[in-house]
C-alpha cells in the first residue's frame, strides 16, 4: 500500500488537527500541508514544489470558499484526487462539488469512516470514483 500525500483545507483548528490525526493514524496518509482559507490553499497548491495525491477541502472557509479551491485544483498539472468534507453535504451541494471537479463528497457528521475507506482504497491503487462497496 502506497502512502498518500494529502493537503487539508479546513478553517477550524480543532477539526483540522483531529482530521490530520485520524487520517495519519487510520489510513496510509502523510499530511504535507494545510490551509484555512481559499487564498492560502490556492497559493500552496499552485507552487510546483508542493505536490500531493489528495486534497481534502471544506466548503465554508475562514475567507473564500472551498468551491474556489476545487476550481483551482482541477487545473493542477499533476493529477490529484479532490475530496470535499463538509457539514453541508446536501444533495445540491454534492452535485455542485462534483460538477466543479470533486471526486467524492463526504459529510463530516457521519461519513468519516467512508473517507478513511476511500483513502485506503486510493493508497491500494484503486481509482475510488463514484460509490464504494464495503471491503469483504
Task: For each feature predicted by the language model, list its residue ranges.
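Conserved acidic carboxylate
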Residues: 10
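Alpha4 helix (beta4-alpha4-beta5 surface) of REC/receiver domains from two-component response regulators
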Residues: 68, 89-106, 110
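Short amphipathic alpha-helix used as the core "switch/output" element in two-component signaling
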Residues: 67-78
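Two-component/phosphorelay signaling modules centered on CheY-like receiver
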Residues: 13-33
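The short loop immediately C-terminal to the conserved phospho-acceptor aspartate in CheY-like receiver
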Residues: 59-60
Amino acid at each position: 500500500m502506497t502512502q498518500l500525500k494529502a493537503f487539508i483545507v479546513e478553517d477550524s483548528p480543532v477539526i483540522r488537527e483531529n482530521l490530520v490525526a485520524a487520517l495519519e493514524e487510520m489510513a496510509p496518509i502523510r499530511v504535507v500541508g494545510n490551509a484555512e482559507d481559499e487564498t492560502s490553499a490556492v497559493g500552496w497548491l499552485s507552487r510546483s514544489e508542493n505536490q500531493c495525491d489528495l486534497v481534502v477541502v471544506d466548503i465554508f472557509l475562514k475567507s473564500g470558499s472551498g468551491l474556489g479551491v476545487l476550481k483551482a485544483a482541477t487545473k493542477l498539472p499533476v493529477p490529484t484526487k479532490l475530496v470535499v468534507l463538509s457539514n453541508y453535504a446536501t444533495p445540491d451541494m454534492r452535485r455542485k462539488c462534483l460538477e466543479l471537479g470533486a471526486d467524492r463528497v463526504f459529510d463530516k457528521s457521519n461519513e468519516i469512516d467512508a473517507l478513511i475507506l476511500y483513502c485506503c482504497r486510493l493508497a491500494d491503487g484503486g481509482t475510488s470514483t463514484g460509490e464504494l462497496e464495503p471491503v469483504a
